[in-house]
Swiss-Prot record:
Transmembrane segments: 351-368
GO biological process entries: complement activation, classical pathway; humoral immune response mediated by circulating immunoglobulin; immunoglobulin mediated immune response; phagocytosis, engulfment; phagocytosis, recognition; positive regulation of immune response; positive regulation of phagocytosis; positive regulation of type I hypersensitivity
CDD domains: IgC1_CH1_IgEG, IgC1_CH3_IgAGD_CH4_IgAEM
Organism per entry: Mus musculus (Mouse)
Name of the protein described by the UniProt record: Immunoglobulin heavy constant gamma 2B
Topological domain ranges for the Cytoplasmic compartment: 369-404
Amino acid sequence: KTTPPSVYPLAPGCGDTTGSSVTLGCLVKGYFPESVTVTWNSGSLSSSVHTFPALLQSGLYTMSSSVTVPSSTWPSQTVTCSVAHPASSTTVDKKLEPSGPISTINPCPPCKECHKCPAPNLEGGPSVFIFPPNIKDVLMISLTPKVTCVVVDVSEDDPDVQISWFVNNVEVHTAQTQTHREDYNSTIRVVSTLPIQHQDWMSGKEFKCKVNNKDLPSPIERTISKIKGLVRAPQVYILPPPAEQLSRKDVSLTCLVVGFNPGDISVEWTSNGHTEENYKDTAPVLDSDGSYFIYSKLNMKTSKWEKTDSFSCNVRHEGLKNYYLKKTISRSPGLDLDDICAEAKDGELDGLWTTITIFISLFLLSVCYSASVTLFKVKWIFSSVVELKQKISPDYRNMIGQGA
């Protein structure tokens, strides 16, 4: 059933932005199906955005996105989180404002006068989230995929958190756990990562994170596994800069990846074999046929496009042979000329064969017609000669009879 998301802005309280930058967040919860798109200030904030993978729990997805901005610009300047869920035709805009006090006993003074707000009263206790491995790590044998368990809103008074990991209900002890202090609300965040085997994830094994803390009435368990379903390989198309762009200082290449399922995919760019960093991907979008598509745009200076031999769009997806497909576009004049000539020759040959076929057909028809006419004339002349000869030839038999 299609379910629109609920959107919650996550912002520090007044007085907690003491550093040079501040991180703002947007929690998108309770939607189905995938996917959603999160933009900040209509896309003008993009360089410091981090989007976390979606988590499926109880048939609904939850994901989050964060952006880091200079503390000198917020909250004096507006920051807005925009969430679009195409499947439900839902668009939600949330303005990020300093969070007000949770406790009414010791309220926070206005931000202009505030130096340090009291720590929030975390009556609800810690929250636990589990995240799947990066798809590139899963599909590349040289990398190590990891499942991540994140515990947030841990009180500084009871910071001890016990995290246990299970694979198909068998406990494992290879996880690495780190603790971080969240300055914006004076809480503890605990991150535990479990290295896993590639085949364990691909085969659908279940990974469980079990968390316990004094502020929890009972342990919290979160499970995750690879979503089962039809696997469809993507089709990849790489598009050169439009002709109108070539007169400008900057140009862009586009990689269109369509028709794939599931939605987990990795797209990267290289030029002459070297990794490119200046590109942006859309989130996978659910198409009308149930498959997904994605756009990736590589930006560069026009001079680089003119000087570089080739650019490649590298796609990794479980539906591909060896999980990998590379599409390359070349700026080499020789190669470009060959491609153009090849296409022109194909067109010329098609036209030439058509002309030759028509000519041969007409020639054979003409020969047949001429032969038929000639044969008819010869037959007519021969018949006339025979008839004439019969008329003028003397009747020697009668002549002999008369002589006798």
